[in-house]
Amino acid sequence: MRFKLDGRIIFSKDVEEETQKDIVEVLENRDIFLKGVPEGKENEASKIETYEFDGKDLKLKMTSGTYTRAHEGIVRLKKPIMEKVGRKHQIGIRDVAIDKYIVTLTAEPSKVSELKGLKVPECEVELESEKINIVFENLGDGELKRNIIDRAIKFVKNELDKQDQDLTFEVCKIAPGTIVSDYKAKREITFDTDPTELAEPYGWVKRFPGRGQWFYTAPMAKLFRAFESIIIEECIDKIGFDECLFPKLIPLDVMYKMRYLEGLPEGMYYVCPPKREPEMFQDFVNEMMIKKEIPIEKLKTLLRDPAYVLAPAQCEPFYTFFDHELVDVDHPSKFFDKSGWTYRWEGGGAKGLDRVNEFLRGECVWMGTPEFVEKVRDDTLKYAEKLAEKLDLEYWTEVGDDPFYLEGRKSEARGIEFPDVPKYEMRLWLPHVKEERKGVAVTSANIHGTHFVEGFGIKDYKERKVWTGCTGYGLTRWVIGFLAQYGYNYDDWPELIQKKVGKLPEIPKVITWP
């Protein structure tokens, strides 16, 4: 994609020459646009092609690829400009205006032609042979905060790729991304720093050598356990789930039955058991001792083929428990597990404390009639929303576009019954993200219909319909969402959290850290 923007930053008064000089220093610092851009992709980030001062306006022509897109770039300029000139020249920024914005997507001519007559709210769509131009005009801060640009791009992409879409878009009766409920915090949220940036200097976490992993020290662990206790009391116990201890080392055959290997095979950690040949491992040890490095190639020869994965969904053992069993939907099952880590391989997507490869959550899984399964799903979501409101945490709930059991899958030929909405996702607002209104997903409430029932040969003894559902309360993300809105000052926290946490423990005493 390419982005071309004509816009203005509108100041509170005419920009005088001395002020202009300071602003130009900011404009010429391209590092502003390179934060978060992968190495080698710098040309994809926002670039200021021209600028001009005109009274109160700073007129900008900007272009970009897919990293720090132009509409994000113009917003990103506000903070460093104000830091440079606000107090020094007694000037403020009144608004950001985008006069014209062209987003260009490319596709095969045959696919482009299928979009003829497509209407997209708040923009125009212009088609060329291999190009789709999405044209916006007269956008202000309000439209940017409503995220209409990203929604329009997503809408066009969905239309463009309909024949290649994940099964989710075929199944779901409400458009994924639709917000079904939200809550605005009653207090003024003044904390606006990325909690990851403070967690390390404060000594609450320390980076672990593995990608997407952290060592959580005593204060963070205390907060984790407080949230775990509150979620169990305020959500899980109120619905009557029974705690079980689920295995976390999952045989590949289980993942095959779940169809997980079809949808997201690249998102798991695969486990290779070692061969039980001590003399061969002695060679490995000897070589390591002599070379003072790990002989990876030799180690590969000592491992069997992949046989397991580390649990990527946490609910896998539930379906295995009922594999080819006869059940009675008059006596439905409701289990929950909080016994250990869940593992997802995010690759380059792992960042900060909110998107990690190793995380904690309370996983609820249930089975019964379709009506029972839908009611339990609704209850798990309802109590999560009530908890957020009790803690005055700003959130919204939307229709999910990636239910884990459908993610990446294109078709289903087994005659599976699916719910009208496979997934709802509840997000806590992240105030430190300025370019768009972004939230961290803290609760994922899913209904699977007969997907797993068919895959594991589960039947009701009277041949009645059996459905399953699962809700994950992401403990790691609840904590990060909470810290993003409240910060690290204990005195600013809600009374419920303070009582659960008690006295915060001290960080480890280390001379060279944090």
Curated annotation (Swiss-Prot):
It is an enzyme of class 6 (ligase). Zn(2+) binds at C315, E363, C470. It catalyses: tRNA(Ser) + L-serine + ATP = L-seryl-tRNA(Ser) + AMP + diphosphate + H(+); tRNA(Sec) + L-serine + ATP = L-seryl-tRNA(Sec) + AMP + diphosphate + H(+). GO terms for biological process: selenocysteine biosynthetic process; seryl-tRNA aminoacylation. Keywords: Aminoacyl-tRNA synthetase, ATP-binding, Cytoplasm, Ligase, Metal-binding, Nucleotide-binding, Protein biosynthesis, Zinc. Its cofactor is Zn(2+). Pathway: Aminoacyl-tRNA biosynthesis; selenocysteinyl-tRNA(Sec) biosynthesis; L-seryl-tRNA(Sec) from L-serine and tRNA(Sec): step 1/1. ATP binds at R344, W345, E346, R355, V356, R477. It is found in: Cytoplasm. L-serine binds at A313, R344, R361, G362, E363. Its EC number is 6.1.1.11. It comes from the Archaea. One of its GO terms (cellular component) is cytoplasm. GO terms for molecular function: ATP binding; serine-tRNA ligase activity; zinc ion binding. It holds the Pfam family tRNA-synt_2b. Homodimer. NCBIfam families: PRK00960.1, serS_MJ. Consists of two distinct domains, a catalytic core and a N-terminal extension that is presumably involved in tRNA binding. Belongs to the class-II aminoacyl-tRNA synthetase family. Type-2 seryl-tRNA synthetase subfamily. Catalyzes the attachment of serine to tRNA(Ser). Is also able to aminoacylate tRNA(Sec) with serine, to form the misacylated tRNA L-seryl-tRNA(Sec), which will be further converted into selenocysteinyl-tRNA(Sec). This is Type-2 serine--tRNA ligase. It comes from Methanococcus maripaludis (strain C5 / ATCC BAA-1333). The gene is serS.
